[in-house]
């Protein structure tokens, strides 16, 4: 019995710590979390936490229930095989082999979990719930609520991941609120920014490392870079379907930390239309597989409708179509037939999916508005959008997303410039090898194309002018960056877009509203985020200074809050 007691203690104590029964398993090193997957106690602890903290049922925790039953049955069986009435009684070697047989199910389960990391992800989500349950008061801070209102001094109480109260002026005693204090003197509190136009799979720069072009790795890092930069939500408008859905679901479950993602999935375009060039030069062995993830090229209205329904079934949040013929040398594309675009739009409305339409000139914009787009992406980069078309957009409530940053970035890229690389925020979020590779490529002159630089500079100038006219005409505005394209880095580009809007003549409050409340409405998440309003998720950005005096203050980030969790920004890139 003494030997048995010692053996039990040797096994029991590691199980107690590794299972998460004493400290959250998510706080353990990665190797320890993986080792814990071979212990049935890990699933029991995770299961009970899911039931108590997330109000889950037994079916939601089938793995934990199974682990408990298997442990009971096999443990009883093993005890019977190894039972001895007397200490001196010998156990036959054959019976000792039952120990290995009993451990086999746990070895198999552990190997699967070590590979899939499903239970590890659930542990991280539960730990995140714990972090988001804190109560704290941000006080003595300037508050922009998102809808244009500014409180020069006030406070926000965050509780259980939500905005519990908003105080205009003096705040209550934090001791009575049982709240920790976050001092906001000299700072401004904004709703978390939202980027309405991103390509998470694009690295935005040049690298010699293949992993920097692997969407399974670049997309999670892009979501982390967005959150690091105070962008708490984004709309993916042209990324691999499976990878983007997987990332969105992991972030929603709390098993991965990053900006919440709205997924449009593959882009609807013509057979040789814009978007297909990204897969044109891929090896034949993978070309069709990648193409199926990135684009849809319907040939008939029936096929277009079916493809929209399939995307809805897959779980997308929106749909994107491209209505663009291109311009200039080497940038001409087939334009998607209007009958097919109309079919996409009609089915998207039936499926309650917002439709974003990429446009290139005023004709494209007119067709997009007539067809019923929810948002016009880019607007016209080649000619002026007529006043009557802006009037119609205002009447129909069609959003304009001008994406000034990407037009400026291409103009610089083809001119042999890379001003974005000097941004402090860019240097913080972009891997060093991409910064170095991009700088080396630009300095080499290999990307220098003066004719294209001139075209994009004209496009940028036209887009700026149309933005100002659209605002004056009452067109609802949203803000996106087209990040993932060259020199348009995920996260920092949103702050640059704000600066470009203000430089174009847009009032700061209007620009900030486009980047928060309006974007939330477009993405269909306004009931959860996008504003500083009681009851919404606490997605917040605290910055040093006053953006209404200097819009670049949004880059001076003091604190990022996501669903109530105060983000440890430096740790966002630790997870591989």
Regions found by a protein language model. Name each.
Residues 188-255, 271-276, 339, 363-365, ...:
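Metal-associated gating/positioning segment near the N- to mid-region
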Residues 124-130, 143-155, 168-171, 461, ...:
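Acidic, glycine-enriched loop/beta-strand segments at the rims
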Residues 219-244, 258-266, 316-326, 354, ...:
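Divalent metal-dependent hydrolysis catalytic cores, especially in the metallo-beta-lactamase
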Residues 294-295, 299-336, 380-504:
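Active-site neighborhoods of metal-dependent hydrolases
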Residues 69-118:
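Junction motif at the cytosolic side of a transmembrane helix
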Residues 1-14, 22-23, 81-97:
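A structural motif at transmembrane helix-loop-helix junctions in multipass membrane proteins
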Residues 16-74, 82-89:
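Membrane-interfacial helix-loop-helix junctions in multi-pass membrane proteins
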Residues 148-190:
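Histidine-rich, glycine-flanked metal-binding segment
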């Amino acid at each position: 019995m003494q030997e048995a007691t010692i053996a039990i203690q040797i096994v029991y104590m590691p199980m107690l710590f590794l299972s998460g029964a004493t400290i959250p398993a998510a706080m353990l090193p990665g190797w320890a979390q993986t080792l814990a997957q071979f212990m049935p106690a890990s699933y029991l602890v995770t299961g009970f936490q899911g039931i108590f903290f997330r109000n889950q049922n037994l079916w939601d925790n089938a793995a934990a229930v199974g682990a408990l039953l298997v442990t009971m049955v096999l443990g009883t069986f093993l005890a019977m095989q190894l039972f001895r009435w007397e200490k001196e009684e010998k156990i036959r070697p054959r019976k000792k082999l039952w120990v290995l047989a009993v451990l086999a199910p746990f070895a198999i389960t552990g190997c699967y979990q070590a590979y899939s990391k499903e239970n590890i992800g659930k542990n991280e989500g539960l730990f995140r719930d714990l972090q988001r349950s804190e109560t704290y008061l941000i006080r003595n801070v300037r508050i922009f609520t998102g809808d244009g209102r500014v409180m020069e001094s006030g406070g926000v109480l965050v509780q259980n991941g939500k905005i519990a109260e908003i105080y205009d002026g003096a705040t209550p005693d934090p001791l009575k609120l049982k709240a920790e204090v976050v001092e906001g003197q000299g700072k401004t509190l904004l709703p978390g920014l939202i980027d309405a136009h991103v390509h998470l799979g694009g690295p935005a720069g040049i690298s010699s490392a293949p992993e920097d072009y692997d969407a399974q790795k670049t997309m999670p890092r892009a979501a982390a870079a967005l959150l690091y930069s105070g962008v708490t939500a984004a709309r993916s408008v042209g990324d691999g379907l499976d990878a983007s859905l997987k990332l969105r679901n992991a972030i929603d479950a709390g098993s991965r930390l990053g900006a919440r993602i709205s997924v449009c999935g593959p882009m609807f375009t013509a057979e040789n239309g814009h978007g297909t060039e990204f897969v044109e030069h891929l090896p034949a062995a993978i070309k069709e597989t990648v193409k199926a993830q990135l684009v849809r090229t319907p040939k008939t209205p029936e096929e277009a409708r079916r493809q929209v329904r399939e995307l809805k079934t897959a779980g997308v949040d929106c749909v994107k179509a491209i209505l663009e013929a291109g311009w200039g040398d080497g940038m001409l594309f087939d334009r998607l037939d209007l009958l097919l675009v109309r079919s996409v739009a009609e089915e998207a409305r039936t499926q309650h999916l917002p439709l974003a339409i990429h446009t290139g000139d005023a004709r494209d914009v007119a067709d997009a508005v007539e067809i019923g787009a929810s948002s016009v992406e880019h607007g016209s980069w080649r000619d002026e959008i007529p006043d009557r078309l802006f009037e119609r957009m205002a009447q129909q409530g069609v959003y304009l997303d001008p994406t000034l940053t990407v037009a400026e970035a291409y103009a610089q890229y083809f001119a042999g410039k890379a001003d974005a690389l000097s941004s402090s925020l860019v240097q913080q979020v972009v891997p060093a090898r991409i910064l170095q590779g991009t700088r080396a490529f630009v300095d080499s002159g290999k990307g220098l194309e003066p004719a294209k630089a001139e075209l994009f500079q004209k496009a940028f100038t036209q887009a700026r002018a149309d933005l100002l006219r659209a605002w004056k005409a009452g067109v609802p505005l949203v803000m996106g960056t087209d990040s993932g394209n060259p020199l348009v880095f995920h996260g920092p580009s949103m702050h640059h877009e704000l600066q470009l809007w203000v430089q174009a003549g847009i009032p700061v409050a209007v620009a900030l509203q486009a980047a928060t409340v309006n974007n939330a409405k477009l993405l269909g998440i306004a009931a959860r985020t996008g504003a500083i309003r009681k009851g919404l998720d606490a997605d917040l950005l605290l910055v040093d200074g006053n953006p209404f005096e200097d819009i670049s203050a949004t880059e001076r980030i003091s604190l990022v809050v996501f669903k109530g969790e105060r983000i440890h920004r430096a740790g966002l890139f630790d997870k591989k």
